[in-house]
Amino acid sequence: ETEMAVVTPLFKGHDELPDHASRFVDVDQLDWKPTPCEGIEMKILMEDEETGMMTAMFKWAPGSKLTFHEHVELEQTFVLEGSLVDDEGTITAGNYVWRPPGSQHDAWAPDGALILSMFLKPNIFLDGENKGVQLK
């Protein structure tokens, strides 16, 4: 069997499964890890190490901000709790937004947020101390 490039990083037990078996993830067993932006943490639920495709949960502290970045490919976000704001509008709990490749913005969470995001490729920060860094 060949080694799969699609993984849930830091989750135990998947390595022993056959290639075509479903990968069930107990999200509570995953640790939150810091992102380059203060006050925003993430749990990677699924990541394709070859293509960059990723599904992740993000926890935003009240007042935290994701600095100016570009969505290199399609990005999708569903807000589970709280709300996210950018210059185009606000997305609240229970709602969904998708952004086309090439879209650029900052985003912030005045009251905090818990979101689920799906990326075909990681975001790239465009300015400040994180310029050129991928979000992963």
Residue map of PLM features:
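Ligand-binding loop in jelly-roll beta-barrel domains
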Residues: 40, 101-126
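Short acidic-glycine-tyrosine-enriched beta hairpin
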Residues: 85-109
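Residue-level marker of beta-strand positions
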Residues: 65, 95-96, 114
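Short histidine-centered beta-strand/loop micro-motifs
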Residues: 46, 56-58, 67-71, 88-89, ...
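Glycine- and acidic-residue-biased ligand/ion/polar-headgroup-sensing regions
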Residues: 61-64, 70-86
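Conserved hydrophobic/aromatic beta-strand scaffold that supports enzyme active sites
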Residues: 42-44, 55-57, 76, 96-98, ...
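Short, charged/polar surface micro-motifs in flexible loops or helix N-caps
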Residues: 50-52, 61-64, 85, 103, ...
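A short, N-terminal "cap"/entry segment at the start of jelly-roll beta-barrel domains
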Residues: 3-51, 132-136
